[in-house]
Amino acid sequence: EEYSRSYVLMEAETHTVIRENNGDKRVKMGSFNKLMTVLLAAEAMDRGELSLETELVASEHANSMQGAQIWLMPGEKMTLGDLLKGVIIGNANDACCVIAEKIGGSEEKFTELMNSRAAELGMNDTLFTECTGYYGDDAQYTTAHDAALLLCELSKHNELTEMFTSRIDELKSGEVQLVTTNRMGHRYKGSVGFKCGTGPSSGYFAAEGARRDDICFVTAVMDCPDEDIAMALARELLDIGFDGYLITSPPIPDD
């Protein structure tokens, strides 16, 4: 545990903090911020504004994205479901940008939505400046506690679990192969998925969640020196949750 500068283990329904270390310390978030993009897409589907079958069109701006991508050309159409696969499994910056522009009208406007949603969730020490985590690494920040609050909200979206726990997939009739870096998603019992990764100038993070029976735990492990340490600590923290805690209802007194 000494290797991670910041982590939180939280029960997803009550937001009870089970374990933490420097949970309120500001850290660079790297590609963690894609999870807010995914959440806003899921909530747009909840409102009926979009569906997994909705076709979105790639812009010149999306095409200009560097880093991980699914090679979208300007004017190319792709369903929201496939774009989400690109983001969740492949960490694709161009797919993330297409989703952001569809929901917000522009990436700048979408970033405003990211920050307002963070405030609604009680993420009071978090700032988003763009939608991918690739370009705004020095300016964007969060805390392990704030990150865990986002994970609690994401854990409600069962329609995303299959994508979050997929190891591999493909797009464009096999032209684009997607391979997740999140090894826990398809290995940890009860996993509801999420993400691990880094950014150009941030440490490694592991954002994980799992549900067994009627209890769900999420953990945000931030600012680690390497991916293996982040993943091992996330697994250890989830084990602590499932091995040591359960949800009970207080007894109802007899009249």
Model-derived regions, located:
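Active-site-adjacent loops and short helices of periplasmic peptidoglycan-processing enzymes
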Residues: E1-H145, L154-S155
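Penicillin-recognizing serine hydrolase domain
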Residues: E2-S6, G105-D255
